[in-house]
């Protein structure tokens, strides 16, 4: 199966599907259609009925081959790649039997070094796909697409493997947070699903952050600095004051595990006006609400010193911890856990310090945990995919549909 995985991942990663957060269309970029149309064609060649809507959501069905009435399971992956780094002219490189030593990426000065990326030490002996140092790889999440496609191919070639109805979904714009926004849960018509969008071997994730964005706008009064005493209000300094009142230890670079944070993403302005953009994250719903409350309290504390209330705050929720919707349905986690155990894969159920499409889909009525893909260092030139771990991910998909047919 390795050769098929390499071939398919190479073909998909060389198609530029970068999304654009500034766009208002869905998909956010026309080039995402290039991969969507290819996948539609390949699914049809496998004999699967497909449904590609005007927003770039591609659904397909592998019909049940058993008489029993068992739950319909879905497998999801996103076609877009991150806007954080160059995604054009991707030139995948293959490392056979990785020796665990630093590896120079193409003709660049970039080096894939286990001292910097210690997870590489667990991949000695694996076949890796890496970049040439000039682009990201796009294994996030084209590895997930490959794994789903190869699992479907295998099931088609092995009709003796019993399974219920399987729904497949390939979606746009996950990297800019819009993946589920126009996802039609009723049209997808699955009882539950799994995103193939994790990273390291053994990841099985069903806890995500609660997430919000806070935009703070500071309005100043700009007068000539020579006569500014008791008249000027410097919006930039108001912004600095605002940020200084947040806990210095509760930032991404000083937190881990279940610890939440405030993250200042952008700060720009002039004396007249300054804008601060934060993301707020916490796994615990009560702490999440307290974090948002703290933002409002700081606004009020600063505004209390002025007559015209110069600091404005706009907070918008982005997604919530999917555990709230998944934990009441333990069989959704028990199924992959049984499969992992059968395949001798150690299950890592640590919470996601982020979110997936499943974070939103779970609150839309489609409970959706996340499973590993075997890739790492997403969104940049050091991205890699372990073909060996990808092969295990394919086996997990096959094992899940077998388990559902046998035990439900």
Curated annotation (Swiss-Prot):
Q: What is its main location?
A: cytoplasm
GO biological process, alphabetically ordered:
peptide catabolic process; proteolysis
Q: Which InterPro entries match?
A: ArgE/DapE_CS (IPR001261), Bact_exopeptidase_dim_dom (IPR036264), Peptidase_M20 (IPR002933), Peptidase_M20_dimer (IPR011650), Peptidase_M20B (IPR010161)
Query: Cofactors per UniProt?
Result: Zn(2+)
Provide the binding site for Zn(2+) 2. Answer: 140, 175, 379
Q: Which UniProt keywords apply?
A: Aminopeptidase, Cytoplasm, Hydrolase, Metal-binding, Metalloprotease, Protease, Zinc
Record-listed E.C. numbers: 3.4.11.4
Enzyme active site: 80, 174 (proton acceptor)
Q: Where does Zn(2+) 1 bind?
A: 78, 140, 197
One GO term of the cellular component aspect? cytosol
The enzyme's main class, written as a single word, is hydrolase
The protein's matches in SUPFAM superfamilies, at most eight in alphabetical order, are given as:
Bacterial exopeptidase dimerisation domain, Zn-dependent exopeptidases
Q: Which GO terms describe its molecular function?
A: metallopeptidase activity; tripeptide aminopeptidase activity; zinc ion binding
Reaction(s) catalysed by this chain, per the record, are:
Release of the N-terminal residue from a tripeptide
Is Ligase there in the keyword field? no
Highest rank taxon of the organism: Bacteria
Q: Which residues form a coiled coil?
A: none
Compartments where located = Cytoplasm
The UniProt similarity line reads: Belongs to the peptidase M20B family.
Alphabetized NCBIfam families for the sequence: peptidase-T (TIGR01882), PRK05469.1 (NF003976), PRK13381.1 (NF009920)
Q: What does this protein do?
A: Cleaves the N-terminal amino acid of tripeptides.
- UniProt protein name: Peptidase T
